[in-house]
Curated annotation (Swiss-Prot):
GO biological process, one term: translation
Family: Belongs to the bacterial ribosomal protein bS21 family.
Pfam short name (any one): Ribosomal_S21
Gene Ontology CC terms, in alphabetical order: ribonucleoprotein complex; ribosome
Protein name: Small ribosomal subunit protein bS21
Domain of life: Bacteria
Gene: rpsU
Family matches, as NCBIfam families: S21p (TIGR00030)
Keywords: Ribonucleoprotein, Ribosomal protein
GO molecular function, one term: structural constituent of ribosome
Amino acid sequence: MAKTVVKKNESLDDALRRFKRTVSKSGTLAEYRKREFYEKPSVRRKLKSEAARKRKKF
């Protein structure tokens, strides 16, 4: 979990910007979006295969 301590004489906007950066770097939101709904293993395999095919195409 991302943790940000507000430094002395630091504005709230700067602290929020720093927090958002740490969250995005840690991948917390991406992981949340990925696990928001249950995905059957067969569907997961299908999506993975399609993504690989798409990458190979380009």
